[in-house]
Amino acid sequence: FAEIGAGQETARHFFRAGGASGTIAKAMSAYDKDFSDAIYGIEDDKRYVTEARLRKMLDHEVNLVEERILREAHPHKMFFAYANTVATIDFAKKYKGHGWVGIKYQVDPDQGYNEIVLHLRFKETDARLQQETLGVLGTNLIY
């Protein structure tokens, strides 16, 4: 799981529900923009909540899984990477909040990855409700 910006909610939902040890190999949160840039690079447009950023995150995280968990040692294991980059509603309630959520996953360990990418526009007017929505959405997407 890699969640940047205001979106550290999906991993929280998994940890809160229990059973995360059988699903989550790694949870990474980068709320700081400089730290995020150090991991994923700087986007040409200098924006963080974009489809391009999400796709870069997914590719990076899948590559890390494949580097760190050897296929020879786990020939039947299917891998996935979940990521989101989100901005929730601001304090002045001028910007309503939106984000990008995605998952790359295998349905067969010997084949490539499928991919789902979603763009969200939050309708809630409270940041906590937006975070809860994101956590539920991410959990259901992974399920």
Put a short name on every predicted segment.
Residues 1-143:
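Non-catalytic terminal extensions that flank enzyme cores
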